[in-house]
Amino acid sequence: MERIMINPLLSIQNSPTKFLKPPLSSIHRQQQQQERQSNNNTLFMGEARPRRATTFACLSIRRRRNNNGVSEFEETARFEQVGGKGISVLCGLGYWVQGSRCFPWLALNFHMVHSLALQPSTLQLVQYSCSLPMVAKPLYGVLSDVLYIGSGRRVPYIAIGVFLQVLAWGSMGIFQGAREVLPSLVACVLLSNLGASITEVAKDALVAEYGLRYRINGLQSYALMASAAGGVLGNLLGGYLLLTTPPKISFLVFSALLSLQLVVSLSSKEESFGLPRIAETSSVLESVKKQISNLKEAIQADEISQPLIWAVVSIAMVPLLSGSVFCYQTQVLNLDPSVIGMSKVIGQLMLLCLTVVYDRYLKTLPMRPLIHIIQLLYGLSILLDYILVKQINLGFGISNEVYVLCFSSLAEILAQFKILPFAVRLASMCPQGCEGSVTSFLASTLCLSQIVSAFLGVGLANLIGITSSNYSNLSSGILIQSLAALAPLCFMHLVPMSEPVIEKEGKRGISKRSRRNRRVGRVVDKESVTYRRERESEEAQR
């Protein structure tokens, strides 16, 4: 019995007309391709792929296209038709709150120094030990990729992470024992970082998946702007509140912001974003094992592993003395919280400006010389703390407040900016289907290297005798830190010389497997079958 299938491109069934009559020669196919390329300024109804043609309804209008072949008008129309407003509110608020986390952390640092009277090394140990949940980000990413909660695999994880943060910061704001007893305070901070890491992984995966699905550019820039805006406002608000209110008020205000994010997350429906549902498998454990195997295979490639090793080692081998410097600024120099908060604001603005400069001017430069310059500047910028500790700035007529405002955050900003070229490179080389896993693995390894750096700093502070009543050897520790930051320049050969060359699909051609996957429907016709066999034989000869 002859079986006739539906061609979804034409939506016609059981028709005697031969709509897929093959061309006579390969020359005819080349002419048709040239004609299609000459019409690249025409915005036609539907997409080249039938899967996308059934998703959007695009107007037939002539408009100039961008580099990706999608006009700004079409991009805006798609964004509105496929849940763009909902994802803007959900992720925009999420990244803004994520950037605002510096606001309660500033209050927490002052609380641990003044109320709990922690030593500088103990303060730094608590700060970075509580970041351990961030190390497990790849696990959260794999679970979010393969395990559905209800009808979604992104938004429910965002809601769960936000709820954990509300529980942690709300407890520290309401219950005195949760913030006055160190073990309970550490437990609350661990719970908060666990929720933040789950939320960040799910949110990053949602933005990446949505942008790739609908070929919408600029979502990452939008996320960065929202996070930077949250950081600026969070530091301003944190410095102001600490001058007039106790730290618990800052915890409660941030809990209110998280509650707003939780309401938005619970009211968002992932189905409205039009994202495809992955095929269900017999076992979730098998899917997790497969995803972990793919991640392991991806990071073993030299193009990914070598620059990742350099980035991780260059952070881990530098002993961090941020806790000691913070205690010195607040206990010896008696700087107001508003001054420290404003210095963080200036640092966030500097980071945003550096990111824009990199995207426009520095992205095309060879990677190895660029990283070499950034690392050299980072090692030298650490000496700015040496100038502050030795009070050399007063000899030039620069007060401590002005000096901290202008130069205190420079080393921290350069350390963050150094990661950007590596993140761009790894994102451009991620195998298909492993984007979220590889990026979360990068984030977790960088977090682990920062924890190792903090522990080395604690050991160095104890070795040279830095305490809350004795900062005489802090300048020596800063010199050691600066020399350690210059040491990674000795193995710059691990950093690639240039960015990977990504060929466009139109230039490199389409493989036989891709052609086979792009065929739509099937019409039982001897001429069509014969033509397909002849075409495959021609490709094999080529």
Curated annotation (Swiss-Prot):
Keywords assigned: Chloroplast, Membrane, Plastid, Transit peptide, Transmembrane, Transmembrane helix, Transport
Family: Belongs to the major facilitator superfamily. Folate-biopterin transporter (TC 2.A.71) family.
Coiled coil: none
Role, per record: Could mediate folate transport.
Signal sequence, renumbered to the chain: none
Biased composition regions of type Basic residues, renumbered to the chain: 509-521
Lipid bilayer topology: Multi-pass membrane protein
The protein's name in its UniProt record: Probable folate-biopterin transporter 8, chloroplastic
Classification of source organism: Eukaryota, Viridiplantae, Streptophyta, Embryophyta, Tracheophyta
Keyword flag Repressor: no
Membrane spanning stretches: 103-123, 132-152, 155-175, 181-201, 223-243, 246-266, 308-328, 338-358, 369-389, 404-424, 446-466, 477-497
Region of interest (Disordered), ranges: 24-45, 506-542
Subcellular location: Plastid, Chloroplast membrane
Cellular component GO terms held in the UniProt record: chloroplast membrane
Compositional bias segments (type: Basic and acidic residues): 522-542
InterPro entries: BT1, FBT, MFS_trans_sf
Transit sequence range: 1-78
